[in-house]
Amino acid sequence: MSDIIKLKHVRKEYDDGFVALKDINLTIESGKFYSLLGPSGSGKTTILRIIAGFSEPTSGQVFFDGQDITNLDAAKRKINTVFQNYALFPHMNVFENVAFGLQIKKKDKQEIKLAVKEALHMVQLDGFANREISELSGGQQQRVAIARAIVNQPKVLLLDESLSALDKRLRKDMQFELREIQKKLGITFIFVTHDQEEALAMSDEIFVLNEGKIQQSGSPVDIYDEPVNDFVARFIGDSNILSGRMIKDYEVEFGNHRFECADAGIKPGEKVEVVLRPEDLDITDIEHGKLRVVVESQLFLGDHFEIKAIDSDENEWLIHSTNPTKIGKEVGVYFDPEDIHVMRFGESEAEFDKRLEAYEGEE
C-alpha cells in the first residue's frame, strides 16, 4: 500500500507556552483503519486537526500523497471529518444534511440525488432521506454524519471521538459498522479515541500517545502483547507489572524466583519491568503453580471472574479466570514463558524494535 499522509517533525506549541505535540513523525498508508489512542491531553486530537487543516503546526511538515500541504486551506484537502458532536444542521432533513457539501460544490441535482442515495445505503439508512434530525437516535445521527462525510468521496476520513456519545451497546454495534464501511469504501480512516477497546477492535494500526509524544505504534496484537514501556502496558488493557532483573537471555528474575521467558538482548543483571496479562494466568494447585498467592477478592463479570491475590512478597496479582475460587485460599499460579514480557527502562520504540529483530533473527 502507498503512503497517503506523512507528518515529519511536527511540533505544536500554543501562545501560553504549552507544547501539545513534540517532534511527531508518523506515516499513514492508504486504505487502512488507524486509531490515535491516548488519554485526555495526549495530543491525539491536535494531530487530527493538523491533518484536517484546522490547525497549523508550529514547525514541521504535513504531506498528502507526496505533496506538502502544511499551509493548504482545509477546504482544499481531500479529507473529511466526522466530529464528536456530529455537527449536523438541525434545520435540515437527512437528505439536505448529506447533500450539503455537494450543493456547495454546485454539483448537478441528479448527481447529488444519486450520490446521497448511495451514501445513505452505505450506512444502512435507506428510506431516511426525508427524516428530520430531531427524529433520529444517536446512532442514526452518527450514520448521517458519516454519510455526509463519505458522499464527498474523500481519500481520508477523520473521526474525532465520534462514538463517545453513544451508549455501550450501540457503541459496540457502531464499531463493527465503521469497520465494515471502511472496508467497503477502501479509503483511509483515522479514528481518535481514548477507549482502548475501540482501538483494539477496529484498527489495522494504532498510534499510542501520551504527553505529546508517540509512545508506540503497530498492530493491535503487537501493542497488546509487546508493550514498549510502562505507560503502554498500563493503558492498553489490564496488566500485572513487577520489578525484575534479567539473569541472561531467556531467563528473568522477579518475585524472588527465576523464570524462563521469551526475551533476549538485555544485559545480565539489568533491572527491568515484567508484564503478565491477567488472562494469561491460570489458577492451579500449589504443586503445579509457578507462584503461590492468597486470594483476597473475587468479582463475577459475566464472562470471567476477576480475582485479586497477593504473594508472600506483598506483590498484588490480578487474575482473570473462567472458574471461581475461594477468598482466603492459597493457590498456585501458572503461566508459560511466552506469557512473560520483559521491558527495559527508558527503551524507545526504535530501540525495542531493533532488539526484537536481532534476537528473533537468531532463533
Swiss-Prot record:
Family from the record: Belongs to the ABC transporter superfamily. Spermidine/putrescine importer (TC 3.A.1.11.1) family.
Name of the coding gene: potA
Species the sequence originates in: Lactobacillus johnsonii (strain CNCM I-12250 / La1 / NCC 533)
UniProt binding sites for ATP: 38-45
Predominant place of localization: membrane
Assembly with partners or alone: The complex is composed of two ATP-binding proteins (PotA), two transmembrane proteins (PotB and PotC) and a solute-binding protein (PotD).
Protein known as: Spermidine/putrescine import ATP-binding protein PotA
Domain annotation ABC transporter: ranges: 5-236
Gene3D superfamilies: 2.40.50.100, P-loop containing nucleotide triphosphate hydrolases (3.40.50.300)
CDD domains named among the record's database cross-references: ABC_PotA_N
Pfam families (alphabetical): ABC_tran, TOBE_2
